[in-house]
């Protein structure tokens, strides 16, 4: 789960954030302003300061916020001087916008506010529809307006060119005041309340926000055009209300509620994608007539309210179709305010103690939750005041025997982390500042100060010598329990030598100087152990899931606050050193104990082990259905100690018992099958791979299937002596189900003579779930999920269904993925009723898949497999190719045809795409790389002996918004890298690839190709983009660059090779067609070419998604001459960019003299 933050405001107007990965409230970086309330999202936070002005806080990111400004220069031809700036009176402006109606000279295009800055000066855009224009960027037409072309013709009477300039938002990690260009007479009054939401309104543009505000006079205002690329918005719009509004709340979707002065609630109706401001108001009566609604907060499908008597209420029956709900339900607890965040999680501030509470037990099936639980988190600034010299020594007894007082003992081995409630006001022990003069005369043996607080700290933390029980706590409060502390290699001996003066008495060289032991300042409003008093909380940007709760609700009660701070300051990197040391010692000990006994004969030379079970088997012949069978896996160990296995499948045909057997040393893949109703998997052998007809088995439960998969996979790996993590040279691939497979390449795989056939490659599954993967021969592997989340390989193996012996015990983490399932609603037009769901007998199903051949209804459509679970309702998908109208419909003349978003006279059919999100949770050797979502990633392919192996590894990526990024700091020891470097582009990109010689190729979303010049290890981002013409009448969608070869794939499945690439001209000269029927291409460090073919016909069946290897690829024949077909049937992605294993030279190659280099030979790096 990615890290997110909870925002809060204390009674002094200071803004704090609490990370889901941390345990301390951190003060906002820009703390100059005092705020009354805030409303947060994942990317930014809006707030109302004490001056009643609105501010926005945009979080910093490696990807800048850029906005493109455009202006068009228009010219007309005349017989005297050719094209010139003199236009006809009826023509458009000489400098205009794209429509020609608005006058837009370059010198009058200004920045919208002081929070923006220009990236560069104006320049001409020489890209026209994915094709480069001639120098100057002019496009020609017969008149204004008309269809423009990049070629000048005899009847081209007008021309225009586009000038562009980018501006960048610079006010990040600071509170930026929202400017207003409105008429001063119509400016809104000072604001009293504000709410941000609407980011999940059905298929709104990514980053779109709805910002609502309430003025002191009770008026409701809406901020126009707020989005990721325009975080400030443009202007305020006033909305009429039936009364004076006090407070307002906007949910992530289409819910908007407000409270009136009279205590009633207002509900905004009619909010949708085309009308985010809604259309009308409805009034909802409060729960009781005596106490009206004082505060309200809404989520996706919930409404929580607080009445004037501080009672908390939950609104039942709220959804998009019924935003008013049905009735009120009183909840336990008294709150001053509540806030609904992500996933309908609820936060609140207690009425009496002013603490932040979290509503536990909120799930999609129980939206009201179960109980309130206080967040036990101190402020980050308290860490600098909670330490003292005595706290150092009291901490020493928990970290070893380096520091010993006069009455110390080791902690009890029954320590455990306990979950306690936050102490009440009477239980708080404010720490007293230590006096320097008293500390100077303290006991040097024990290191204790003279203060009473320090004595209590040591006595509570370190029990007496020989005693296993701590001294009873003389202060009221919960009984302290010992806490389990992590090991550390920090040396505390240095603290013995330092007298217990004040914090300034500790030298900076001490290993604990990072604690910042400073005396308490008089400016702090709280004591050391006092909890802050909160006034407002906002969870709109905080993601909390029931399966992964933050560490906000537990404290180590057996420790004083200073020792607790110390234990939390130890990083995982510090605790990893002793773990590695112990592991190395155990490994060496095992080797010493085993080496001396290897010459002894085994007591049992042969052993047989059998596992049986009941499964179902897909019968290969009539009646072609699932048949109940008995399985028996027989494992035996030969004289040579090698274990082998045979799988027997016993079935009955016409009351006759038969069986088939499979030697597991012949199995090349065990693949889980995408099935909505059965837990099934397939077994492939070389023969079955050529036939495209695997052995398919199904288990009764998911656990049974996982057990058999893990056991069979382990047996196959033992037969082939494959174990542990994949080698750095491994070939990675992904199936359409998202399963990850790796294959160890044989040296003969890329041999020019007699290469290893692809159908004999052994594929084993790795835990996790990805959409694509990219590997490097130095062991760096990245992946991208269906939800565009980036993941990095941790070096483990197994996970998912592979547990126990088939999985590593470390480097396995929880992984989740989200994808959308799409169905189509089809309608036909008739003269009487217009478009209806009644079609012709020859038409497709009125609810179908994209092809129209399979019926798919909302009720009958299930998640892709039983491992997935729905996480949303059905919604209209407006992002389909071709565009849609405001209701999501696409029109065409008939089924099937080319669809477009606007209706014409010849359109007799239409369709609408519906989508629903589903989620999968699994585990694997993958760690998330936050926080930028990626669309594509490429790692430089390297051979082990390359000169650049000492440099950091070059990694380029494309974000889901189309930004090009370069990852810095990637290495074998730090495969995740350190930060992103943004590389500017004039349009969003879709695919990117970096070759072995740092040649970077990319494809834009409009299908055009680009080459990045001057990319070196010392200049990782290069200097400029070169526009490369695409193949004639083709739009590219993917590119892959090897050592000297560059291949590209277009939208029609055609594979193209870039000719003419030389060291002096790395852009090449032209595209040459290689093959069709290709879905994905990967070019390796040896210029080897592997693809995923769309359809491959086998001897028994047709398979979609097949791994194919280009044969005959040589330096003088880089395109090769044929295809070798490997594993297939549902493969989506392959990466061979880590395979730098060269084939051994044959005797004939060694005897032949080396041929002289030709002009079209390989490029020297």
Swiss-Prot record:
Role, per record: Tethering factor involved in autophagy. Involved in autophagosome maturation by promoting the autophagosome fusion with lysosomes: acts by associating with both the ATG5-ATG12 conjugate and phosphatidylinositol-3-phosphate (PtdIns(3)P) present at the surface of autophagosomes. Also involved in selective autophagy against bacterial pathogens, by being required for phagophore/preautophagosomal structure biogenesis and maturation.
Region Disordered: start-end pairs: 404-486, 1140-1165
Sequence similarity: Belongs to the TECPR1 family.
UniProt organism field: Homo sapiens (Human)
Protein's cellular compartments: Cytoplasmic vesicle, Autophagosome membrane; Lysosome membrane
Extent of the TECPR repeats: 209-240, 254-285, 301-332, 344-376, 729-756, 953-984, 998-1029, 1044-1075, 1087-1127
The name this protein goes by in its record: Tectonin beta-propeller repeat-containing protein 1
Keyword set, alphabetical order: Autophagy, Cytoplasmic vesicle, Lipid-binding, Lysosome, Membrane, Phosphoprotein, Repeat
Domain notes: The PH domain mediates the binding to phosphatidylinositol-3-phosphate (PtdIns(3)P). While full-length protein is unable to bind PtdIns(3)P in vitro, it is assumed that the binding to the ATG5-ATG12 conjugate exposes the PH domain, allowing the association with PtdIns(3)P.
GO (cellular component) term, any one: autophagosome membrane
GO molecular function, one term: phosphatidylinositol-3-phosphate binding
């Amino acid at each position: 789960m990615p890290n997110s933050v909870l925002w809060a405001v204390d009674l002094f107007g200071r803004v704090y954030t609490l990370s889901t990965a941390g345990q301390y409230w951190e003060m906002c970086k820009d703390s100059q302003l005092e705020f009354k309330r805030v409303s947060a999202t994942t990317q930014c936070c809006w707030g109302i300061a004490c001056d009643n002005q609105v501010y926005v806080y945009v979080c910093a990111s490696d990807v800048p916020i850029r906005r493109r400004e455009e202006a068009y220069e228009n010219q007309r031809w005349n017989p005297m001087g050719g094209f010139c700036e003199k236009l006809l009176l009826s023509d458009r402006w000489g400098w205009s916008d794209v429509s020609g109606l608005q006058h837009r000279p370059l010198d009058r295009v200004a920045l919208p506010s002081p929070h923006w800055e220009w990236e560069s000066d104006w320049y001409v855009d020489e890209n026209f529809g994915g094709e480069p224009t001639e120098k100057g960027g002019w496009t020609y037409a017969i008149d204004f307006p008309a269809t423009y072309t990049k070629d000048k013709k005899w009847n081209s009477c007008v021309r225009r060119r586009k000038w562009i300039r980018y501006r960048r938002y610079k006010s990040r990690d600071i509170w930026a005041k929202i400017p207003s260009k409105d008429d001063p007479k119509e400016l809104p009054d000072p604001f009293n309340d504000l709410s941000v939401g609407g980011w999940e309104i059905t298929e709104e543009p990514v980053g779109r926000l709805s910002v609502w505000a309430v003025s002191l006079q009770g008026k409701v205002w809406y901020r126009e055009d707020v989005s990721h690329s325009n975080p400030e918005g443009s202007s305020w719009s006033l909305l009429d209300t039936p009364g004076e509004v006090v407070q307002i709340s906007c949910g992530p979707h289409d819910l908007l509620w407000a409270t009136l002065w009279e205590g009633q609630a207002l509900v905004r109706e009619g909010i949708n994608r085309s009308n985010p401001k809604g259309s009308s108001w409805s009034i909802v009566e409060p729960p009781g007539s005596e106490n009206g609604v004082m505060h309200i907060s809404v989520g996706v499908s919930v409404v929580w309210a607080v009445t004037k008597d501080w009672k908390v209420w939950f609104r039942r029956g709220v959804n998009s179709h019924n935003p008013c709900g049905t009735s009120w339900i009183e909840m336990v607890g008294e709150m001053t305010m509540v806030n609904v965040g992500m996933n309908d999680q609820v936060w609140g501030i207690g009425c009496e103690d002013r603490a932040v509470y979290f509503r536990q037990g909120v799930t999609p099936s129980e939206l009201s939750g179960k109980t309130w639980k206080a967040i036990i988190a101190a402020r980050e600034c308290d860490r600098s005041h909670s330490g003292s010299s005595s706290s150092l020594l009291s901490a020493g007894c928990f970290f070893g025997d380096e520091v010993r007082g006069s009455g110390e003992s080791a902690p009890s081995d029954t320590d455990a982390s306990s979950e306690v409630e936050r102490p009440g006001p009477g239980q708080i022990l404010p720490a007293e500042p230590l006096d320097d003069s008293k500390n100077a005369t303290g006991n040097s043996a024990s290191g204790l100060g003279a203060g009473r607080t320090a004595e209590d700290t040591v006595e509570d933390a370190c029990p007496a010598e020989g005693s296993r029980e701590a001294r009873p706590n003389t202060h009221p409060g919960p009984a302290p329990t010992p806490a389990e502390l992590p090991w550390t290699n920090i040396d505390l001996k240095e603290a013995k030598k330092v007298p217990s003066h004040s914090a300034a008495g500790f030298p900076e060289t001490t290993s604990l100087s990072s604690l910042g032991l400073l005396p308490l300042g008089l400016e702090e409003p709280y004591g050391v152990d006092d909890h802050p008093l909160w006034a407002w909380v906002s969870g709109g940007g905080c993601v909390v899931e029931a399966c992964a709760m933050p560490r906000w609700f537990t404290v180590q009660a057996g420790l004083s606050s200073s020792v607790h701070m110390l234990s939390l300051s130890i990083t995982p990197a510090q605790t990893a050193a002793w773990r590695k040391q112990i592991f190395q010692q155990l490994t060496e000990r095992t080797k010493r104990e085993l080496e001396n006994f290897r010459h002894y004969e085994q007591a049992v030379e042969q052993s047989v082990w059998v596992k049986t079970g009941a499964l179902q088997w897909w019968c290969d012949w009539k009646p072609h259905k699932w048949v109940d069978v008995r399985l028996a896996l027989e494992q035996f160990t030969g004289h040579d100690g090698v274990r082998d296995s045979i799988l027997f499948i016993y079935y009955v045909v016409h009351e006759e018992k038969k069986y088939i057997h499979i030697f597991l040393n012949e199995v090349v893949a065990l693949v889980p099958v995408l099935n909505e109703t059965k837990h099934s998997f397939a077994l492939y052998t070389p023969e079955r791979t050529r036939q495209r007809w695997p052995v398919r088995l199904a288990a009764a439960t998911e656990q049974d299937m996982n057990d058999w998969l893990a056991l069979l996979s382990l047996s196959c790996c033992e037969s082939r002596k494959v174990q542990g993590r994949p080698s750095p040279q491994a070939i990675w691939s992904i199936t359409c189900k998202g399963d990850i497979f790796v294959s160890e390449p044989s040296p003969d795989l890329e041999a020019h003579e007699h290469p290893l056939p692809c159908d004999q490659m052994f594929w084993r599954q790795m835990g996790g779930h990805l959409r694509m993967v990219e590997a490097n021969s130095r062991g760096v592997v990245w992946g991208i999920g269906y939800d565009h989340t980036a993941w990095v390989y941790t070096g483990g193996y197994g996970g998912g269904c592979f547990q126990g012996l088939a999985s590593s015990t470390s480097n396995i983490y929880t992984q989740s993925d989200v994808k959308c399932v799409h169905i189509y609603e089809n309608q036909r037009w008739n003269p009487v009723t217009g478009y209806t769901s009644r079609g012709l007998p020859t038409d497709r199903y009125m609810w179908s898949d994209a092809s129209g051949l399979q019926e798919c209804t909302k009720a009958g459509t299930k998640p892709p497999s039983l491992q997935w679970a729905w996480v949303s309702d059905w919604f209209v998908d407006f992002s389909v190719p071709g565009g849609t109208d405001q209701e999501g419909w696409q029109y065409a003349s008939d089924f099937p045809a080319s669809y477009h978003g606007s209706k014409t006279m010849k359109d007799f059919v239409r369709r609408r795409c519906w989508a629903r999100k589903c989620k999968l949770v699994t585990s694997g050797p993958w760690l998330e790389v936050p926080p930028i979502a990626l669309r594509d990633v490429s790692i430089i392919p390297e051979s082990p002996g390359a000169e650049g192996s000492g440099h950091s590894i070059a990694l380029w990526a494309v974000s889901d918004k189309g930004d090009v990024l370069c990852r810095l700091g990637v290495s074998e020891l730090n495969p995740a890298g350190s930060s992103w470097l943004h590389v500017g582009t004039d349009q969003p990109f879709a695919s990117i690839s970096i070759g072995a010689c740092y040649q970077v190729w990319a494809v834009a979303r409009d299908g055009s190709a680009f080459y990045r010049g001057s990319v070196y290890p010392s200049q990782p981002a290069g200097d400029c983009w070169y526009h490369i013409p695409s193949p004639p009448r083709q739009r590219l969608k993917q590119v892959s660059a090897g050592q000297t070869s560059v291949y590209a794939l277009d939208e029609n499945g055609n594979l193209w090779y870039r000719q003419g690439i030389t060291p002096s001209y790395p852009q090449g000269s032209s595209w040459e067609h290689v093959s069709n029927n290709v879905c994905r291409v990967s070019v390796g460090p040896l210029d080897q070419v592997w693809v995923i073919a769309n359809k491959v016909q086998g001897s028994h069946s047709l398979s979609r998604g097949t791994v194919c290897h280009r044969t005959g690829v040589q330096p003088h024949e880089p395109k090769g001459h044929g295809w070798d077909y490997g594993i297939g049937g549902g493969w989506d992605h392959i990466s061979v960019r880590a395979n730098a294993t060269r084939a051994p030279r044959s005797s004939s190659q060694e005897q032949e003299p080396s041929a002289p280099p030709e002009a079209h030979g390989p490029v020297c790096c």
